[in-house]
């Protein structure tokens, strides 16, 4: 008996009135993940694209893999550099299961380590965070699907990996679980679930962490997975000493623009490599999942606002002098622009609205980075702020079109 035939045989038990009716959501999710649904329309269908929502979410999930794999590599690379500088490798192996497991699997944790050893060490930090987020979020998704008697949506594939990529590698797992609960339940399911949430769940979860547990999501001690090591992010360094203050926190060597573009700097797991993010973004833009108008709008808003601050200048705030091409490669700007701002649910729907929505994000991100003395990163708050205005932009665009058509027919 083939797998497909077995699924078809047991399906009646999960349908309304069947013995396992309450488990239909899990059955449907498994069956449609393995095979294309066998349902057909009774009349002519209007198919504009063969890419359904399930495949779209999976494609976005896969497009984040370049940033994920590089992020794991960078976490391991930064940790190895730090433990060597501190001379604490043996203490790390005896005191942290991540180092102990990597060492037991044959990883070289010295400066001569190859990419595989660095990737393995980074994976021991990233995968537990990702699995915690995925399992906790999956639990809430299944629970709400069963209570509301609808199919499980694949949107959490994207939410889970995004949230795992925008946190530091040292985040406690219980905080990851708590943030996931907030993002899924409060920011999405309370408003009706996928397609009805007005803000990005992954960003809402990170905002919850930032305001509830700032010590574990910001500061100088959370970005490198090594005990006793303290090192500021590149954005924080610029806020203190300008471009001349950009130094590798371990080696003390100057950070070049190419270092930041490739991702040879500490930071949140998936935010460091703009190059990897561009590769993934090219996939979803080519597939017409992400709106190029929003991306272009974010760039326009960022370039215009940073140029304005460059012209104004400041003798006390070095961030006024940061050019747009540094804003692009530092912090979470690239990840936010390509994968958060373009979220089709919480973004503007109309074409003109997408332009204004993107411009607002770019401008607000730079404004918060430069003017806010307490928090040099502004992309998270900028996107959440723009999420609130997305319906307003769409409303204004629609009303303007109505007025124009009325005036045309007078």
Curated annotation (Swiss-Prot):
Main location: membrane
Its EC number(s): 7.2.1.1
Any one annotated GO CC term: plasma membrane
UniProt modified residues of type FMN phosphoryl threonine: 233
Membrane topology per record: Multi-pass membrane protein
Domain of life: Bacteria
Pfam family, one: NQR2_RnfD_RnfE
Role noted for this protein: NQR complex catalyzes the reduction of ubiquinone-1 to ubiquinol by two successive reactions, coupled with the transport of Na(+) ions from the cytoplasm to the periplasm. NqrA to NqrE are probably involved in the second step, the conversion of ubisemiquinone to ubiquinol.
Protein name per Swiss-Prot or TrEMBL: Na(+)-translocating NADH-quinone reductase subunit B
Source species: Pasteurella multocida (strain Pm70)
Gene: nqrB
